[in-house]
């Protein structure tokens, strides 16, 4: 198999079996719109086929171990991710830390006292879609560490009717129990504004850079790492308010 990322604005997908997950059903129920994948999503491809017209299709999975749905999408919409792309950034540096500033909605990466990376992010939202204040979406303030990393992950939460379920979230670095993570974001481009349900939203490019720079480092296959199992060292994540 191989990892591949969507490189077009969107691509319609075909369902071979399943269709039971919330993200798929909600798309069908939303005016009968076709299920789609979007730019920046990352999937594990484990089969390739051609149709009667000679067009190549990938079978895409929400993560390395597959999922409840069996999906096919035109291969031309994807760029295969080569194993060389997962080479760690500055692996020889031991003193690394990530600082997420909730007030300014920024993220910085430090090697010692030197800032080597800076970007805008979107952390936990302060208001819901109706403008009502919310507290349970706040990104947890404090000193944490990256505990699990995934090249791609299907993430979900919330309650029935008001929940969310999204596959193919790339370059995910979890740093708080419960799934709070730095990860790629394909559903908005409003960075610098509080938008998430607690995670640190970043562009696909920024999330990938942090993923490759921060420990623990991840191998191509299976594309995941858990320090509770491997015992590997990990990078500190400081979430501050100003």
Regions found by a protein language model. Name each.
Residues 9-55:
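Beta-loop motif signature
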Residues 6-17, 78-92:
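Intrinsically disordered, low-complexity Ser/Thr-rich linker and spacer segments
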Residues 1, 37-80:
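SH3/SH3-like beta-barrel superfamily modules
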Residues 49, 62-64, 104, 111-113, ...:
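A mature extracytoplasmic/lumenal domain signature
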Residues 53-55, 100-105, 167-169, 232-233:
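A short, compositionally biased
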Residues 91-93, 117, 128-129, 134-141, ...:
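Exported/periplasmic cell-wall-interacting domains
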Residues 81-127:
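A structural motif detector for short, solvent-exposed N-terminal "entry" segments of globular domains
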């Amino acid at each position: 198999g191989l990892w591949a990322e969507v490189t077009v604005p969107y691509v319609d997908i075909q369902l071979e079996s399943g269709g039971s997950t919330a993200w798929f059903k909600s798309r069908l129920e939303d005016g009968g719109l076709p299920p789609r994948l979007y730019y920046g999503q990352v999937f594990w491809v484990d089969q390739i086929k051609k149709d009667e017209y000679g067009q190549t299709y990938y079978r895409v999975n929400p993560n390395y171990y597959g999922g409840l749905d069996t999906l096919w999408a035109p291969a031309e919409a994807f760029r295969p991710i080569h194993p060389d792309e997962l080479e760690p950034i500055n692996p020889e540096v031991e003193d690394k830390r990530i600082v997420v500033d909730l007030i300014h909605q920024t993220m910085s990466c430090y090697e010692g006292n030197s800032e080597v990376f800076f970007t805008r992010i979107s952390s936990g939202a302060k208001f819901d879609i109706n403008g009502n204040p919310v507290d349970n979406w706040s990104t947890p303030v404090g000193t944490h560490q990256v505990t699990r990393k995934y090249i791609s992950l299907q993430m979900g939460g919330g309650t029935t009717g008001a929940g969310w379920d999204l596959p193919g979230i790339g370059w995910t670095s979890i740093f708080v129990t419960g799934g709070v993570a730095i990860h790629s974001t394909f559903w908005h481009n409003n960075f610098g504004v509080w938008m998430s349900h607690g995670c640190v939203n970043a562009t696909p490019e920024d999330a990938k850079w942090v993923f490759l720079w921060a420990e623990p480092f991840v191998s191509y296959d299976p594309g995941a790492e858990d320090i509770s199992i491997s015992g590997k060292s990990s990078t500190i994540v400081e979430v501050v308010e100003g």
